[in-house]
Amino acid sequence: KEYRRQRQMCIRDRTYYMPSYTAPVEDMMFLFEKLRNNQKYNELEKYKEVTSDLVKDILQEAAKINQNLILPLAKVGDENPAVLENGVVRTPPGYKEAYKKYIEDGWTSLSCDPKYGGQGMPKTVSAFFDEMLSSASLSFKLYSELSIGAYNCINHHATDDIKNKYLPKIVEGKWSGTM
């Protein structure tokens, strides 16, 4: 609550308090180990190759991109919000390049089905990434949120023809969900 109040004052007064964020990778790994044992991930065929070392590597890379690339965008987005000009939405400076890196590095596909180009990680792993992304820059995270919703809706309710047409494009970040 206090952070939010300070941030609103800084925005209003045109000063800026630069937030810091250190992803809690060790805490996340502790939770993953507990869930892995309780949920028996290692007994599920689709998660046989999901080891603690692999998850730790993923989370460490996720921490780097969120701390080094996404976190600085929080200030940029606050000072230069998205605008609608002549029917075209202009995102804050740096968002387009960051989103391109975000999709190139495969962050859109963490828990998506490998059948459609996803990595097939447990939802727990993508939840950890989402927590990091939300903490680094909630406004940036919201750019991908509609795509996650569209993916889940199509994956759970559409015919195979629709899934085959739309899901690979959503997973690779070429298409996104809209409202």
Each PLM stretch: what is its role?
Residues 126-127, 145-151:
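Short, conserved phosphate-binding/catalytic loop or strand-edge motifs used
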Residues 28, 108, 150, 175-177:
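Structural beta-strand/beta-sheet cores of well-ordered domains, especially the beta-sheet scaffolds
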Residues 12-142, 161, 165:
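Amphipathic, small/basic residue-rich leader segments at the start of a protein or domain
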